[in-house]
């Protein structure tokens, strides 16, 4: 996006009724004396909002950054401001995963803005001032380091990108191999906290209805993106550890409880068989997992498929040899 730029400081100033001060730091390889002097304003501020990131200088269509970390001068700026004011929030503008490990524990919060366009300033101001409760979730995994990505060995290969991870694309790769990550697929915080409970599965014939309770245990109205994953317990062929099959954003008022429902069919348990040249569903046991992310599973239940029909079971029977 290369349209009209927005002035986040001006928008925040209007929402807060004045008193917002802004020090502007442009692309520099190191922090200038003027920039260092400007950062001292952090001592006199209630909250500091530090906007950092990449952009067309670092990444774009058909090319990418050489590393996941922010430019060194930006990391230095974050750490210095945070040392002066612990109430520091960092807003990141970037087109992909960013390594925040060098300063994550030094700041009060991180807001990932992506490249949010001409109305991005107004949207970010609404979130930062609490007018809007954020409810977004990551649609990708943030790895701990570049070397953990499955495509690491083929970076900078002209015209060729080899998907050697096979079925384990994206979050499936990290989950199937148990690789620790910085922020998992589906992760996202808000000003609310939610409890998951009371999972019930009504499975009969070709469908399974999955219902559970979602309670907002905070003092702030909010929305939660609930996710449903399926894990095959006795797959006949190689399959990923778990696969996302459904998700829903549920609004729940502070202190209240809502119901979330998903409907699964036998097709949701299927995989593509090269031997049969088509989609097939194997008989066996499957675990239904409900979570706030792929690494934050809150509820589990079992279903059995026999002759293409779904059935709820309490446990997998033990076969004595």
Question: Where do the language-model regions lie?
Answer:
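Intrinsically disordered, low-complexity Pro/Gly/Ser/Thr-rich segments with frequent PxxP/GP/PP motifs
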Residues: 236-274
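Secreted, periplasmic, or luminal enzymes acting at the cell surface/secretory milieu
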Residues: 93-223, 229, 254, 282-283, ...
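Glycine/threonine-rich flexible loop motifs
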Residues: 52-71
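Compositionally biased low-complexity segments at domain edges in trafficked proteins
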Residues: 14, 36-53, 315-321
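Acidic/polar, compositionally biased interaction segments
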Residues: 1-43, 72, 239-241, 250-251, ...
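Short, surface-exposed ligand- or partner-binding patches at beta-edge/loop junctions that are enriched
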Residues: 263-294
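Loop/turn elements at helix/coil->beta-strand transitions in domains of secreted/extracellular proteins
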Residues: 44-48, 84-89, 106-108, 134-136
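Short acidic, flexible loop segments centered on an aromatic residue
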Residues: 219-236, 242-244
């Amino acid at each position: 996006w290369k349209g009209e730029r927005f002035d986040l400081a001006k928008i925040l100033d209007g929402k807060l009724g004045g008193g917002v001060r802004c020090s502007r730091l442009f692309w520099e390889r190191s922090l200038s004396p003027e920039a260092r002097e400007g950062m001292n304003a952090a001592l006199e501020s209630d909250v500091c909002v530090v906007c950092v990131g990449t952009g067309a200088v670092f990444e774009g269509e058909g090319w990418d950054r050489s590393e996941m970390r922010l430019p060194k001068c930006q990391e230095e700026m974050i750490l210095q401001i945070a040392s002066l004011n612990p109430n520091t929030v960092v807003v990141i503008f970037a087109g992909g995963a960013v390594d925040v490990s060098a300063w994550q524990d030094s700041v009060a919060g991180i807001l990932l803005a992506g490249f949010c366009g001409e109305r991005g300033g107004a949207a970010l101001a609404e979130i930062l001032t609490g007018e809007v409760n954020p409810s977004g979730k990551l649609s990708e995994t943030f790895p701990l380091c570049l070397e953990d990505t499955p495509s690491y060995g083929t970076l900078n290969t002209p015209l060729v990108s080899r998907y050697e991870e096979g079925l384990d694309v994206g979050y499936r790769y990290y989950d199937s191999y148990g690789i620790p990550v910085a922020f998992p697929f589906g992760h996202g915080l808000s000003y609310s906290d939610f409890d998951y409970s009371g999972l019930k599965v009504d499975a009969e014939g070709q469908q399974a209805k999955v219902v559970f309770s979602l309670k907002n245990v905070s003092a702030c109205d909010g929305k939660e993106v609930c996710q449903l994953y399926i894990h095959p317990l006795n797959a006949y062929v190689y399959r990923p550890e778990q696969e996302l099959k459904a998700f829903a954003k549920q609004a729940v008022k502070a202190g209240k409880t809502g119901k979330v429902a998903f409907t699964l069919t036998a097709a949701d348990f299927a995989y593509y068989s090269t031997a049969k040249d088509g989609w097939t569903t194997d008989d066996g046991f499957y675990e239904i997992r409900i979570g706030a992310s792929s690494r934050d599973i809150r509820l589990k239940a079992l279903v059995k498929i026999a002759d293409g029909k779904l059935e709820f079971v309490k446990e997998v029977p033990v076969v004595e040899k």
